[in-house]
Amino acid sequence: EEATLTWKQLLVHHPGGYYGWRAAARLGKEDLNLQPSPAGTAEEATSTPWQPLASGDAALDQLWRLGQPTEAWETWRLRRGGLPPKDSGDLLVEGRLRQGVGDDWTGLGQLEKAAFLLKPEQCSLLPQLEQALHPRRFAETFAPAAEQQQLPLSLILGVAKQESRFTPAVQSSAGAVGLLQLMPATAAELAGNPLTTEELQEPKRNAGLGAQYLKAMLDQWKGDPLATVASYNAGPGAVQGWQTPDRSRFPEVWVEAIPYPETRIYVKKVLGNAWSYQQERRPAC
């Protein structure tokens, strides 16, 4: 009964993310949908409802409303005088402005910090923050790849957000490249020939190969999202060594026992992203 109450409270106040998913699944309300996205979902996936900036600055809000994000960003920078954002409200505004000028890498980082620092009295910011945290960047590129590989678009978006924050040119210190952070050796195996860094940074090619690898992992683990996403990060060989007889009964325990801290966090982030992309989650204040 105590566990059920905890799940219910989580679902009301934190319906998005990994723990929102696990709460909904444990209560039998809804689960992560791993069915293929319907054909022709690209246009629908990119149609994120417009939201006012609500910065408290009438001129800035007007520029945003008129579809001039660059001018709005420059106005914000000028008025801030180089000062960093001081609280969740500032982080939300600046993060959204950065997104508006194509800087998802920094913008999403600021929005995540805003969510972490959010105070109870700022609860009214949650719907705006939740939407901004889950942009559907490159959906027109990911949707055909998802359709070809029979994957849900929400899962690919969840991986891309965590891997690259939707930044095609990003490269990791380990050598992974592009939107879905493919290792050159893995990409060459999937493509049947070596690819240059520039080729791997091309969104369509990266999306196609990344979706192909993600599908291979999903098939290998017979549709288990936890092992699939862990394998995408740590490799299927490592994940094979972490299997336990009761993993399907106690998936939350299995995740917490993942010996690689990076992979443990990665699994929660990616599947939490996918859950939030699957359907808009609105927390209750």
Locate predicted features.
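Catalytic glycan-binding domains that act on GlcNAc-containing polysaccharides
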Residues: E1-E30, L34-Q51, G82-C285
